[in-house]
């Protein structure tokens, strides 16, 4: 016989800013088309170590393949991690893994998961203490 424990769902508080590390980055093709899927871990504070998944829409077609459109959440995330001058023409998702950024957290419309709030994503200031 194997005993199982129980872990209640934990949601980060909506509207608060957190610092994140990207544990993994993958392109996923699902119900909402192609998306950049990021597994994120919170850094610092009482919620340190909390892990959740966030998705950002990416575009694709037969002629151009997959690409990040200007002005999207995916672009905002990549530039926060790799810098404003990052070359988005030939990006490998592996380059995002281990990257860090800060953003405001929101809760999905159905109240079941956290998400990173588009428009709030940025670089962690250089003067911030290490984690």
What kind of region is each of these model predictions?
Residues 1-131:
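Short beta-rich binding modules
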